[in-house]
Amino acid sequence: MAKKIVETPLMKQYMEIKAKHPDAILLFRVGDFYETFSEDAIAAAEILGITLTRRANGSAMHVELAGFPHHALDTYLPKLVRAGRRVAICDQLEDPKLTKKLVKRGITELVTPGVVTGDNVLHNKENNYLAALYLPEGGQGSLSLLDISTGEFLVSEGTIEHLDKLLSSYQPKEVLVERKARAAFDRTFAWRGFVFEVEDWTFAVENNRQKLQNQLGVKSLKGLGLEQKPLSIASAGAILNYLELTSHNELSHITTLRSIDRLGMMRLDSFTFRSLEILQSMSPEAGHSLLDVLDATVTPMGGRLLRRWLSFPLIDLEEIHRRQRIVATLVRDGELRRELGECFAGIGDLERVTSKVAMGRISPREARALAQALCAVGEVAQLVQAFPMESCQELRQLAEHLELCEALVEDIEQSLTEEPPAALGRGAVIASGINSELDELRDLSAHGKDYLVQLQDRESKQAGIPLKIAFNNVFGYYVEVRSAHTKDVPESWTRKQTLVGAERYIFPELKEYEEKILGAEERIAVLEGRLYQELVLRIARYIQPLQRNARTIAQLDCLTSLALTAETNRYVCPVVDEGRVIDIKAGRHPVIERQLPFGESYVPNDVRLGSDDTQIMVITGPNMSGKSALLRQTALITLMAQIGSFVPAEAAHIGLIDGIFTRVGASDNISRGESTFMVEMQEAASILNSLSDRSLILFDELGRGTSTYDGISIAWAIIEYLHDNPFGRPKTLFATHYHELNDLESRLERVKNYNVSAREVEGKMLFLRKLIPGGSEHSFGIQVARLGGMPQCITQRATEILEQLEQAHLHEVTGLGSEIKITRASKPTSTPSEGVQGVQMSFFQLDDPVLSDIRERLLQVDINSLTPLEALNKLSEIQRLLTTPQ
C-alpha cells in the first residue's frame, strides 16, 4: 500500500502529475536533477543502481527519494525502458529565474518499451515495434504494428495461429490488448513480453476509422483495402490512440498503412520459426542464427529489412528471380559490390533520421549528416546508372527510385556550420551570412573580451591603480580592487561587496556593456533556435522522398550482403521454379559449417524429395549422427532460396514451397500442465491440419514421449496419412529411432529409407555423417552414453541387459505381452554374470488348455506382414482369452 505523502507545494504538484500516470515511473525535474519519489524511487534505485535516500516531508514524515543529474538522462532512461518500465518525463516548463512562484511543470514525453525514439534505447539493426492485438470472439483477430522510429505501419487479419506467427516474427517490444482480453491473450499466445492493458474504447471501430483517415490523409480507407476490414481498423486505430495518450503527436512520417499479405509469403508457424533458429539461436550465448551468417549489411535499415526477408520468405517466383539476378550480378562484379559498400557506410540510418525530422527531434549534427547521407545516395545512383543495362536491368531499375534531393542538400549545407553541435545552445549552429542580425550579435559577442581588456586598461590608467574586471552570477560584471588602493577609486564607482583584502565595484559604462553582451547571447540563442526550426520545417517537405530513398538503399544493402556472403561462403544460385521436386546436391548446413573448428569441413549430403517418387524419407541412425542437422539444413536451404539468396550446396533445384512445418525437439510446457508428448501431438496435429501439396514437413523423433508401441503406431499412422493424403503429397523428412518404420518402404511406393551412417570401431563410435540409402538397424545408444561420460559400470550393465532383451525378442516370440525378467546385476565384489539364463521360461510349457490355445494362435501369425495396428488387435484378443471365465 502506498504511503501517504504530505502535500507541500512541490509534492502536491508532483502528486497531481503522478495521478495522471500511475503505472509509469515519473522522472520529476527539480533544478538540475530528475527526482523520483516513494515507490518510483524504490524501483528506480533497484533498476539503475542509484542511491535510495529519505527526505523529511512534513511533521514526523519522510518519503523515499532517488535521482540523477538531468544531463545523465540518456544514460539512465534506456535502463528503465529495457527493464520493461513506462517512464513519464516531467520537465520544468519555465525558467526558474523568471518566476518567484512554484515552477510550472508538465509531461514532455511518455516513453514506453514500444514507443521509443532515442538512439540510446533503440538497436540499430532491429525494429522497435509497438503492437495492438484485437481479439473479438469468433477465432479471427487482427494485429497492427508500428515502429515510430521508422514510420513503418503494418496490419494483418487472420487466425490465432497466424497472429502468433506474426508476434514471433516481428518481436514487438510492447503489445496493447483490451483489459478484458488479457487472460485470453495469456492462455492463447506463446509470445511473452511486455503487455499493456487499455480500455475497450481504444479499439472502437468508427472512431478509429476517422482517426486513420486523418493520419493518412485520405477520405476513405478503400484505397488501402481496409474499408471492409473492421478488425484491422480496430487494431490500427488503437495504436494511434495510444500514441496520443503518450503525448506523441508529431507523426507526419506515418503516411501509409500496409497490409501484411499472407498470400505472398511462405508459411512458417511460430514453433518452426524458433526451432530453425532463423533470427536467434535457442542458446544465444553459444550458438549462431541464420541471420548471423547472412547479415553483412552496412546500413541499419538494411539490417532491419534482412530480418523481415528471413521472417517472411517469398512464394512469388517473379520477385525471387528478380532478387537472384541482382545478387548474381553483385557476386560477379566484386568491384561494384565493394564501391557500393563504401557508399552505404556514409549513409547511416536514413530511415530513423527522417522520422526524427517529422517529429521535430533532429539535432543540428544529424541534419548536417543527413546532407552527407544524401550525397552518398547520389554516389550510389551514379555507380548503378553507369552499370551496363544489359548486365542487370533490375539493378538499374531499383536505383531509379533514388531521389538526389539536391536542393535540400544545398539548403542544409548553406544554412548550417560545417561542424554543428549535437544540440542547440552548445555552439554555433547557423552559418554566417544567413541572417544579418545574427552576424552582428555574434560579432559583438566575439569581440566582447577585447572590449573588456581595453576597458580594464583604460580605467586602470585613469585611476592610477591596478584592477581587474570579472563576472559572477550574483553581480554580473564587476571591478575588483585590492584594499590598499581603495582610497584612489573614482567617486562614480559604486561598491557592491567587501572581501578580505579587496573590494568589488560597478560603474555605469560596465553595466551598459553587461546588458548589451548578455542580451546579445540570449538573442543569439533565440535567433538560432528560430532559424534552425525553419530549416527543419523545410527538410520536412522532403519526408516522402527521403523515406523512398531509405527503402531503396535498404534493398540494395540487403542484396549486396547476400552477394558478399555467397562469395565468401561458396554458395550457388539455386533453380527455383513451380516444379514439385527438392533436389539438393552436396548441401551443407549454413550455420553449423561456420562454427566448425579451423581445418574441419562440413560433410555435405544429397537430398532429393519429389511428389511422384521420394515423397517421404524415413531417416534412421544413432544419436549425434547428424539426423536433426540434416533436417534443419534442408529447411534452411529451401528458405534461403525463397528469399532470393544463394545456398550452401554444389547445386540445388527447389520446387516452390508454400510452407515449412517442423516437429523438432522437445518443447515441454509444464507450467500449463502439458507434457512433452501432449505438446508434440498438438504440434503434429496442427501440421497435419495445415499441409498442402507444396508443404515441406520435418518430423524428428515423433512419438518418443510415450511407450514404444504407442510411439511406433502413431508414427506409422502419420506416415501412411502423409502418403495417402487426398489433398496433396507434402514432401517429408521423418527422422526416427523406430527401426520398425523401415518396413514402410515395401508397403508405400513413395516412402524411401535412408540412414545417417555410423560405425563402431574397436568399441568406439565413428560418426560418418553421410546420408546413404537403406534403413539402419542399430541406434548405438549405449555407445553414445559412453561418449557422454556415463560410468563404465552402467554401460557394461546396459550391454548385458541389451543382450538379454535381444535374445528374448529373438527366441521367445511366444512371450509377447508377458513380463520379461532380467537377471540381477552381480555385486561389485562378485564375478561377472554368467550369460543370459535369467530370461523368463516360456509359460506355454504349462499344462493349460487356454494357454495352449494362445500358443497356437500366435504361431499362426505372420510377423513379417503384421502391422502395428494388427499386432495391438491380436494382443487385445489374447487378453480377452486370458480374462474370460472358463
Model-derived segments and spans:
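Short hinge/gating elements
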Residues: 54-67, 149, 153, 217-226, ...
